[in-house]
């Protein structure tokens, strides 16, 4: 018997009140306590929406984040000044209604100092969410190797001479975060890895090869993938009792997508080397490229979610 499994994988749309408040807060026109109340209301609305839809697992809609991975840069010193473009750059593909859209990688993007955590990334998100629902509260965290984007030989080498040394500190912070969430009672964490599809897309894989070369070593796509999965497994091992789901997608922003490839080339490695995972969340709706049966690559996995 197949049991259906439904939960929210990405961010929910921010309500107009929150969008307006974010602008006012950034401009210094709104006090932190007042801004927090508006964020809280947005989370409450997101929880109600999911509960009324009958979901057994709910998120806070990532209402408190600039982007799905931005809780890292918000809680950790060393990333330097950056805008939302740091998370959105790339060649985005669209359909006839949305069209393509391009954004160059910011030239100043790059970690500028040793990473130092000022506070936990998602502990506050989790404790607030847990207090607002009787459902399972899910928190999302980024895969460590997603942060390859934030290393630059020009801007980062004085703090992190190699890309590997930077990723080691990122991984340590995420391990500490998973352990703290488990201590607080979290039972389900989603690890977001949209960059895995970019590793095999001919239009984007060159960036990762270039980052490796500038970071002190050469790396093929397979070597990149193997190392990325090692870092994932390190984070997962920080809380063995917590359910971890790996989310793969091709990027999703304003009904556009970044990668246009099948998961097939990476399926054997991803599905078999992430042996500590409980499940996978595979987003397939943005670009219909997947006709093969990926689930057959790893028949012992507890559950799959196909969006």
Model segments located where?
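Domain-level signal for soluble alpha/beta catalytic cores
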Residues: 1-307
């Amino acid at each position: 018997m197949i049991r259906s499994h439904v939960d929210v994988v990405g961010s929910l749309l921010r309500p107009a009140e929150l969008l307006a408040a974010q602008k006012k807060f950034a401009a210094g026109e709104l006090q932190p306590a007042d801004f927090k109340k508006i964020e809280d209301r947005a989370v409450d609305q997101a929880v109600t929406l999911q509960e009324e839809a009958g979901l057994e697992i709910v998120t806070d809609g990532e209402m408190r984040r600039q982007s799905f991975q931005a809780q890292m840069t918000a809680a950790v010193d060393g990333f330097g000044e950056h805008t939302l473009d740091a998370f959105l750059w790339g060649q985005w593909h669209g359909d006839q209604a949305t069209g393509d859209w391009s954004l160059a990688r910011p030239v100043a993007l790059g970690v500028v100092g040793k990473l130092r955590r000022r506070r936990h990334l998602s502990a506050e998100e989790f404790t607030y969410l847990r207090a607002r629902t009787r459902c399972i509260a899910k928190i999302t965290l980024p895969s460590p190797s997603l942060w390859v984007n934030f290393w630059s030989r020009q801007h980062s080498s004085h703090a992190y001479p190699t890309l590997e040394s930077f990723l080691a500190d990122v991984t340590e912070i995420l391990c500490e975060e998973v352990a703290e969430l488990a201590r607080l009672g979290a039972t389900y964490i989603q690890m977001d890895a949209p960059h895995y599809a970019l590793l095999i897309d001919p239009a984007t894989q060159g960036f990762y090869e270039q980052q490796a070369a500038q970071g002190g070593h050469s790396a093929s796509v397979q070597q990149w993938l193997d190392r990325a999965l090692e870092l994932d497994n390190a984070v997962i091992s920080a809380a063995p009792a917590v359910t971890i789901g790996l989310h793969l997608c091709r990027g999703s922003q304003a009904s556009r997508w970044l990668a246009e490839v099948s998961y097939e080339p990476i399926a054997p490695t991803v599905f078999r080397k992430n042996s500590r995972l409980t499940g996978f969340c595979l987003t397939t709706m943005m670009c219909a490229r997947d006709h093969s049966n990926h689930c057959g690559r790893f028949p012992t996995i507890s559950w799959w979610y196909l969006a």
